[in-house]
Amino acid sequence: MKADRSNYEQVIENWRQKFLDMDQDALIRKFNLEADEEALYITYFSRKLRIDRRDGRITDQGVRPGFDTVMNIYNTFYYAAEHPAASGNLVAFRQVKRVYPFEAAYRRTIISRLQEIFSGKIAELKKACEILGGTPLPQGDAGYVLPVFPFLNIAVLFWDKDEEFDAQ
């Protein structure tokens, strides 16, 4: 008997179907994507991913990427403004329009995890940022701008723990 799909698999399947309903030619223009008859190609953290035009499946050198990667791509296609343009300014997560409901989860999952993993390990964090194609920033003990997509960067500003403060 075939096992039921996980909630994650169901969410990906729903979004895959949404992708198939999107105007792919409009996505190519909007995000300046490479494309051919079979696929669209998008660069995500310096890796070129393939999105099959017929079935909407996303692959990274033939392997399906994880849930977060797939959802970031589908959500970017679906929710981006009609004419997305970077402001050129780096802003705190809480200052991004319409993210307030997600800030607690962001702190709990992303921020606390970064603090836990990289506290006392600045060299490792710098290496990870460089592997992701990051460019150094002068702020923090480790500061980098990371290219999520060619049209969207994020900044990681990390201060290591010391005798007065926890890592942040």
Segments predicted by a language model, with ranges:
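Short Lys/Arg-enriched alpha/beta "domain-start" segment
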Residues: 1-38, 69, 78-133
